[in-house]
Regions:
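Helix-loop boundary and gating motifs at the non-cytosolic
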Residues: 1-47, 227-266
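A membrane-interface helix-boundary motif in multi-pass transporters
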Residues: 31-35, 151-177, 372-391
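Structural signature of the two symmetry-related core transmembrane helices
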Residues: 69-84, 292-307
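Helix-loop junctions at membrane interfaces in 12-TM secondary transporters
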Residues: 86-99, 309-321
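Intracellular juxtamembrane helix-capping segments at the cytosolic ends
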Residues: 109-122, 330-344
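Multi-pass alpha-helical transporter architecture, strongest
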Residues: 178-189, 385-412
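Juxtamembrane intracellular "pre-TM" segments in multi-pass secondary transporters
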Residues: 191-232
């Protein structure tokens, strides 16, 4: 149920409504293009903070019996930050940026502890089903609340609201309430798992030092699985491009003059259309292989990013949104499953922990590159082309991955 709960923040705040609101309302008095750059900068800082915290939080999650308490703490931080966004009005760009950044850290950090609970609530033969089921619930939950939020914004008078601005602020408050309420079942029904505390580590500092030593050991071990390591590097690069598109699409569209209703409706289209296409990508991978399918996904991303440079109308934005829906879920899901096939099963948790940390660190560079390119060129339209570099470089690294050799190494 926590996937259902936290997805509201991902869809309404990170992806759909807040970026548009920030550009058109909170940052309306800023110089042209500055709101989009500020949003990219805030995203970079939040992701960097999360990446720095990740190994330390992972240490506590592995060794101390406080997973649920820390999950609750960061969930509460995220909920409060989302609720505070409802206070943001025209010109409050600083308050908006601070709340958005803190909310991002709370959201990401809570997932560290949530993910660590999975092996404790599902048997080994159930983990894939439980994990994908949670992912589907997340799509559903985020889509349902976003649909309601879109209805408020498109027709505020129908719901007794003054205008779209008030409807947007109510949407942020609804995220806080939704996130909190649907988190309750986890805290009521999931027991705090036993930990390795006491096995040679006695203080918080020693626990963290022990975990970081284990992280360095895992990195050294991964070098033995050369093709899995190359896949990890490739994924970190192109996933950064995917994340940048996801996080900055609506603010970019708003800056180019696409109205708020069209932007949010397009994101809603991605949310629901992405579900069947993710399954179709799985079928495609069964026929031509995961690696080839990922290449197709990256080619589509290159095409839609170039298309974003030429985008002028709402119809263009809808077409690009549909292109995202065709590849977003499938590309990321196949990347994870391909990585899983190239690491020893007995050490999957260890290697996926490293996967998660690398992913968080990698996510910093896309928004940072976009902001730098925007400042250099003076145009977000030109800056969007910088994202193509991540897809091309990631695909180039992926081309060196020998899937069969990697799978053989994992089984030896």
């Amino acid at each position: 149920m926590y996937d259902l709960a936290n997805s509201a923040f991902s869809t309404t705040v990170i992806t759909a409504i807040f970026p548009v609101y920030f550009t058109s309302v909170a940052g309306a008095d800023l110089p042209p293009g500055e709101a989009t750059r500020l949003l990219a900068r805030t995203t970079t800082i939040a992701l960097a903070t999360s990446a720095i915290l990740a190994p330390f939080l992972g240490a506590l999650a592995d060794y101390a019996p406080i997973k649920k308490r820390l999950l609750g703490l960061f969930m509460a931080i995220g909920c409060i930050a989302a609720g505070c966004l409802a206070l943001v009005v025209r010109g409050d760009w600083f308050l908006a940026a601070v709340c958005f950044g803190i909310g991002n850290v709370g959201f990401t950090a809570s997932l560290t502890f949530y993910d660590s609970l999975l092996p404790h609530v599902a048997r080994e033969d159930e983990i894939d089903r439980v994990s994908t089921g949670g992912y589907a619930l997340g799509y559903l939950g985020g889509g349902i609340l976003l649909a309601l939020n879109v209805a408020w914004i498109l027709s505020p008078a129908t719901f007794g609201l003054r205008d779209a601005g008030q409807a947007s602020r109510l949407s942020f408050a609804s995220v806080a309430v939704w996130w909190f309420l649907f988190s309750i079942p986890l805290f009521r029904r999931v027991h705090e798992p036993t930990t390795r505390a006491g096995r040679g580590a006695r203080s918080a500092a020693e626990l963290i030092a022990t975990s970081l030593a284990g992280l360095l050991h895992t990195i050294r071990e991964l070098r033995r699985y050369r093709h899995a390591l190359m896949l990890l590097v490739a994924f970190v690069i192109y996933a950064d491009g995917i994340g940048t598109i996801q996080r900055l699409a609506t603010s970019y569209g708003a800056e180019l003059g696409i109205n708020q209703a069209a932007l949010i409706t397009a994101i809603l289209l991605v949310q629901f259309a992405g579900i069947p296409f993710a399954f179709l990508f799985g079928i495609l991978a069964g026929r031509i292989g995961a690696k080839a399918s990922i290449f197709i996904g990256l080619a589509v991303y290159v095409a839609l990013t170039i298309g974003a440079y030429y985008m002028k109308t709402e119809r263009d934005f809808y077409v690009l949104a549909l292109m995202v829906a065709t590849v977003q879920g499938g590309t990321q899901a196949l990347s994870r499953s391909l990585f899983a096939s190239m690491i020893p099963k007995a050490r999957s948790s260890e290697f996926f922990g490293l996967f998660s940390i690398f992913e968080k660190f990698g996510a910093i560079f896309g928004p940072a590159a976009f902001e730098m390119a925007s400042r250099t060129t003076g145009s977000s339209r030109s800056a969007i082309l910088s994202v193509v570099v991540f897809f091309v470089a990631g695909a180039l690294m992926l081309s060196f991955v020998n899937v069969r050799a990697g799978q053989d190494a994992a089984q030896s």
